[in-house]
Amino acid sequence: MNASVLGLCLSGPLVLLLAWLAPPVTSSWWYMRAAGSSRVMCDNVPGLVSRQRQLCHRHPEVMRSIGLGIAEWTAECQHQFRQHRWNCNTLDRDHSLFGRVLLRSSREAAFVYAISSAGVVFAITRACSQGELKSCSCDPKKKGSAKDSKGTFDWGGCSDNIDYGIKFARAFVDAKERKGKDARALMNLHNNRAGRKAVKRFLKQECKCHGVSGSCTLRTCWLAMADFRKTGDYLWRKYNGAIQVVMNQDGTGFTVANKRFKKPTKNDLVYFENSPDYCIKDRDAGSLGTAGRVCNLTSRGMDSCEVMCCGRGYDTARVTRMTKCECKFHWCCAVRCQDCLEALDVHTCKAPSSASEGAPT
């Protein structure tokens, strides 16, 4: 269907709805991972709004932490989606990092905004505790004595200053969304907040005992963030349970698209639009397709050849790899192995036929 015919088919209200939901192709602070020095980064990363540039110039060391943290949360995103058709692939030369795929207000967009916001909190908070930032240090509120279910303890060590991480992340990450008043901006703000809350959810108290023979007559405790994988796993569960919403009548909030489902909480991820199937390469949708992706012949999950390859079939190639074998334990403290060649079959998804290459997803 060409553009002129499509324009005739869309009614006025529907055109307005699509314009309301679809943001323009823009750059993002996510592109900061490719920047060099802080001054170059602040002045040349496309897409930063004025408030973000102000924070960038005032806190160059924080920006460095954010930039380094981008690799960590993108790797976590790729880990969580490793067995799915869309695998959170990034585009090094794209200013938006993920290309057009996140222009759709989908579950995937909800997850990426949440995990990126969480990643900023994690990176800044960790940098505070490691003494890398002038603007913060350990949590100043964790001093003196306190009580828990095990009795009295003294705050000591270095408690992670997660409140600072959350405050800075909110100011920096949310700045662009707060300039917009459309539905997508509200969706992004909601998912950004859910990501920040997820990091704090796994803040844990760690203690060290002092006393004769470890009797723990005196305890010193501090608060520490859990490994970022816990945040990733939690947000992955929220992705699978994400709630589809529509804007309320006054345009200030959400209501569930299906009245049978519960209203989303601040911890839930929300989205507006259904996802494409990601089966074929579609430049407009930002989908790279699954041609050439490795699939699991024995799996019944999303990584199975049947699901991953979208019914197109798969190719099988015999490959060899070096593995450790014939390992033996040597007294007292060593295990010695030989290097062996192992042959195995690798299955990869077939490309779509020329007839279906341009078919809509």
Curated annotation (Swiss-Prot):
It holds the Pfam family wnt. Disulfide bonds join C77-C88, C128-C136, C138-C158, C207-C221, C209-C216, C279-C310, C295-C305, C309-C349, C325-C340, C327-C337, C332-C333. SMART domains: WNT1. PROSITE patterns: WNT1 (PS00246). Palmitoleoylation is required for efficient binding to frizzled receptors. Depalmitoleoylation leads to Wnt signaling pathway inhibition. GO terms for cellular component: cytoplasm; extracellular space. GO terms for molecular function: cytokine activity; frizzled binding. It is found in: Secreted, Extracellular space, Extracellular matrix. A lipid is attached at S213 (O-palmitoleoyl serine). The keyword Repressor does not apply. Keywords: Developmental protein, Disulfide bond, Extracellular matrix, Glycoprotein, Lipoprotein, Secreted, Signal, Wnt signaling pathway. Belongs to the Wnt family. Ligand for members of the frizzled family of seven transmembrane receptors. Probable developmental protein. May be a signaling molecule which affects the development of discrete regions of tissues. Is likely to signal over only few cell diameters. This is Protein Wnt-2. It comes from Ornithorhynchus anatinus. The lineage of its organism: Eukaryota, Metazoa, Chordata, Craniata, Vertebrata. The gene is WNT2.
